[in-house]
From Swiss-Prot:
Protein's recorded name: Glutamate racemase
Reaction equation(s) it catalyzes: L-glutamate = D-glutamate
Protein purpose: Provides the (R)-glutamate required for cell wall biosynthesis.
Pathway(s): Cell wall biogenesis; peptidoglycan biosynthesis
EC category name: isomerase
């Protein structure tokens, strides 16, 4: 792949398996409102968390190639599953363009904020099975105890817009019971779909726990990297994000409004 030289006016490229990465788009807009954003949601193949590592690595290459065709100055992997199993594929495909994954950003923040060194992680089956969060956290502080729980139904519930549904509360209660007796004071939302279910998650836990939203963590890290490289945009205002999707689900407009709290801009359909 032919690589390009990034400039301050180049866009920030972000990809995810579906609409969950829009939480990262929102966080980037809040942190850096002047930045142009290209977002690719692989809505035709969501969820990634139930796929094999080989398939996830294949998708990671294809998703990155789509973003690279738009000449970004940085690529944010807004998919924890790809961050856990295929970040090296993204980095190889991106060449000289820097890559930031949500997983490392979330792990770093969890280590900084935990007070009792008991951290919980929720994520897709693939992310949890990879042990990537626990490895990243204990690499930074070996004294931290990490308890992980796969919550595979959270992604389809978020994609359906079931943010306050009784079924969501029932499933959350079942999943989060895994943390009973572990005295966690910090919980990492190890999937970018999960912040949309944050209210149900915090209510279900019934105690004061610091919630780590990897979308917010990655926005701060992105700003620092771009500032250090003198690649922050000099524009006054940015246009709406340029949205690319591999399929246009009937509920996409509703989901966009749910995640972004704004109306859906133009959407471009791309083949994968």
């Amino acid at each position: 792949m032919q690589h390009h030289k990034a400039t301050p006016e180049s866009p920030i490229g972000i990809f995810d398996s579906g609409v969950g990465g829009l939480t990262v788009v929102r966080a980037i807009q809040a942190e850096m409102p002047a930045e142009r954003i290209i977002y690719f949601g692989d809505t035709a193949r969501v969820p990634y968390g139930t796929k094999s590592p080989a398939t996830i690595r294949k998708y990671a290459h294809e998703d990155t190639a789509i973003l690279m065709s738009h000449l970004p100055k940085i690529i944010i992997v807004a998919c924890n599953t790809v961050s856990a199993l295929a970040l090296d594929v993204v980095e190889k495909t991106a060449g000289s363009i820097p890559v930031i994954g949500v997983l490392k950003a979330g792990a770093d923040l969890a280590v900084q904020v935990t007070r009792n060194k008991h951290v919980g992680v929720i994520g897709t089956q693939a992310t949890v099975s990879s042990n990537a969060y626990a490895d990243a956290i204990t690499l930074l502080d070996a004294n931290i105890e990490v308890v992980s729980k796969a919550c595979p139904l959270f992604v389809p519930l978020a994609e359906e817009g079931f943010t306050e549904h009784a079924a969501t509360r029932l499933i959350a209660s079942d999943y989060l019971a895994a943390f009973d007796g572990h005295d966690i004071d910090t919980l990492v939302l190890g999937c970018t779909h999960y912040p949309i279910l944050r209210h149900v998650i915090t209510e279900t836990l019934h105690r004061d726990i610091r919630i780590i939203d990897s979308a917010e963590a990655v926005a701060g890290r992105t700003r620092k990297l771009l500032a250090d490289a003198k690649l922050l945009s000099t524009e006054k205002h940015a246009p709406p994000p340029h949205l690319l999707v591999s399929d246009l689900p009937q509920k996409f407009s509703m989901l966009y409004k749910l995640f972004m709290e704004s109306d859906l801009p133009d959407v471009e359909l791309v083949e994968v």
